[in-house]
């Protein structure tokens, strides 16, 4: 791909079809040579833009100037579409690639990889930076637990167990999204001479394009891929209960172990996340007066005995939050992922098994 960053305040021309963030263009190879598509991205809603010129595999290096390339991409299936360009900031080429490290850690578990160092994906869906941030969030609290002395030997092992499968998931859906974007050209017979026509043929072609885009917009609406994945690792306490099935398009809140704890506003307008601590947090929903329940007391005593920092958040009268969370007791990690959930624990030994596994000391 050819990538061009530039500045332009020619909004009359650039916003001819309205304001946008990303706009994709289909190019006719009989008109545009090796170009098979293009896109423009609004970087700051003011004057900074990026144009991508999608080149066919094995194509020759373009000899067009940066300005000519911009005009050709913006013109799409028609002729060049000139705009006033104030500055060409940078022009470069890049090749989309998908790569995944075999391991996220060294053999002695003293070196860890995160972000682009261990995975690459294509931009479709916007998963790349989110993957890196989640890597850091996942690894950061585990490193802190080891340094602070309360993390067990299995804690750092769980980093790769949890994050590498998520990278595979994101890479898969990034490829799916990219295929849908470029698939329009084969799904709909495009004709540059009638796409803007005011007659029935033009209306029919535009309707077909509209229907394809609306039914293949998962790169913008894939909430299940972003929020609905589950961690499987040694520090996640297995549950006999069922969890919502994975749906790439939609996210169903759940506190089943391994999933991200659901966001919800409490009665006072605060977010439940604001109640969490920097280490493990036990959220318990209470019917009576505030204060740890018997289950909460078991967890508190176990945490004290094993020097595991634990915040207990007792919520009274939070029927809406409890309905969404679906359990009376939920153990949440510092990265807001659920370690365990249940309606009660029968003894301190039960709480001990849960807490020691969540901290990486044992795996039952």
Model-inferred region functions:
Residues 75, 145-364:
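Helical substrate-recognition/capping region of FAD-dependent monooxygenase/halogenase enzymes
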